[in-house]
């Protein structure tokens, strides 16, 4: 009886031991699962206009594919309004909440790099990665030779004109003035010079560059009231009678006015194609290279991926930036708004040689990037107001630009 009892006791002990081991194994598995969860890193990316649909479809798709390839990295998007973007970046940085990645106009890189907000990504980029990019496009993301931004969008400009009214597009400023005058009839204006805060400066800069002007010199100092820039505004005054109100007209109004038979010519970029094609039957159009002043010129505009200097996940953030720079992903971004190639392989697409894109592609050979100023918002506001006052006769071109120079050079 005693032996039988000991045998039963032994079986019972072995059973408890097995249960204990199983429980221990379950605990280990649970710990593994928890460790996996702890290993997941969430990075945040600031995208202007995202809530209004800007690149929302493209980034939603790309983020989904990135997270599938990188299960330990999650990407969350933060939206901001275009006009508040730069101030939002400063506020978030000062509150120690700057997103890991921020989409910014390359024109603002000097401001944010000098303020310590941006991370220098020069050492993160391999030679192989750099070689994928068109060199002078990649250079728009540099400040003082350092790569504070990696371009993700590039736009150029063309002259859109009514092909049924204008037999040959104007090739220089004198011809532009004459054609604008000839086509200002009834409700139709011959040309447009928008001066809105959101986009007007880029369109004004086309003419500044065509006249051999600049905004800052080689040392980064303002030269806004230069002889060349005053001459540009004097030309604008000649055009003033043939353009819609420059103060209230925005760049986004131009294509709508064109298809409504209210405008004969305007300057803009590839994003206008959808609107223009819809009106082709009643308002046929063609695209030409921008008319030249003393020289050919166009404003080269890029937006860039940037990284916060206080990000705790710089490695993961750069992985996403690198992912977005792959050909298959960059092509989707470029196509979203009729932009132009960032990468060499993108430029091989034959569509950039068609009648719509070719004039905008060819003018980029004579392009100048937006000026890198100490504070873009301050410059943008002061400069556009100066142009408005000159065009509306409130001040002479010299007086308007003198005021702007004095205000910004303080």
Regions found by a protein language model. Give the residues of each.
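Conserved N-terminal structural module of periplasmic/extracytoplasmic solute-binding proteins
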Residues: 7-8, 20-111, 270, 292-295, ...
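C-terminal motif of bacterial Sec signal peptides marking the signal peptidase cleavage site
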Residues: 16-18
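Extracytoplasmic/periplasmic substrate-binding proteins
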Residues: 47-48, 55, 61-62, 234-313, ...
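Extracytoplasmic "Venus flytrap"/periplasmic binding protein-like
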Residues: 62-133, 140-142, 171, 257, ...
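Hinge/lid segment of periplasmic solute-binding proteins
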Residues: 81, 106-158, 168-179, 185-189, ...
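Short, solvent-exposed loop/beta-turn-alpha elements that line the ligand-binding surface or hinge
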Residues: 122-133, 189-191, 195, 213-231, ...
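Glycine-centered hinge/linker elements that transmit conformational signals in sensory
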Residues: 179-183, 219-248
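Long, aromatic- and glycine/proline-rich binding clefts that accommodate carbohydrate-like moieties
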Residues: 285-288, 334-385, 389
């Amino acid at each position: 009886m005693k032996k039988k009892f000991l045998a039963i006791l032994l079986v019972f002990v072995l059973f408890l031991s097995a249960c204990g081991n199983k429980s221990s194994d379950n605990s280990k598995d649970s710990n593994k699962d928890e460790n996996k969860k702890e290993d997941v890193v969430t990075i945040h990316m600031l995208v202007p206009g995202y809530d209004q649909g800007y690149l929302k479809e493209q980034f939603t798709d790309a983020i989904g594919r990135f997270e599938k390839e990188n299960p330990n990295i999650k990407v969350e998007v933060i939206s901001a309004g275009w006009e508040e973007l730069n101030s939002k970046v400063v506020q978030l940085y000062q509150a120690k909440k700057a997103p890991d990645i921020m989409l910014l106009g390359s024109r603002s890189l000097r401001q944010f790099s000098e303020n310590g907000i941006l991370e220098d990504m020069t050492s993160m980029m391999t030679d192989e990665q750099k070689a994928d990019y068109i060199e002078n496009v990649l250079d728009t993301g540099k400040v003082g030779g350092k790569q504070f931004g990696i371009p993700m969008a590039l736009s150029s400009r063309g002259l859109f004109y009514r092909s049924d009214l204008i037999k040959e597009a104007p090739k220089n400023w004198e011809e532009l003035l004459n054609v604008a005058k000839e086509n200002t009839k009834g409700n139709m204006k011959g040309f447009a010079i928008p001066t809105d805060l959101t986009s007007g400066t880029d369109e004004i800069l086309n003419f500044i560059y065509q006249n051999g002007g600049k905004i800052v010199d080689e040392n980064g100092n303002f030269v806004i009231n230069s002889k060349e820039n005053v001459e540009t505004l004097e030309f604008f005054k000649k055009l003033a009678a043939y353009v819609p109100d420059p103060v209230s007209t925005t760049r986004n109004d131009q294509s709508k006015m064109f298809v409504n038979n209210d405008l004969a010519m305007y300057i803009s970029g590839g994003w206008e194609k959808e609107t223009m094609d819809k009106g082709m039957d009643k308002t046929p159009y063609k695209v030409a290279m921008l008319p030249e002043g003393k020289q050919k010129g166009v404003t080269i505009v890029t937006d860039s991926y940037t990284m916060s200097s206080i990000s705790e996940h710089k490695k993961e953030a750069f992985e996403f930036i690198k992912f977005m720079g792959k050909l298959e992903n960059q092509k989707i971004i470029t196509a979203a708004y009729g932009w132009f190639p960032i990468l060499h392989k993108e430029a091989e697409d034959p569509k950039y040689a068609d009648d719509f894109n070719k004039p905008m592609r060819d003018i980029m050979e004579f392009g100048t990037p937006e000026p890198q100023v100490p504070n873009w918002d301050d410059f943008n506001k002061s400069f556009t107001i100066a142009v408005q006052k000159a065009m509306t006769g409130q001040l002479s071109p010299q007086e308007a630009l003198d005021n702007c120079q004095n205000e910004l050079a303080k």
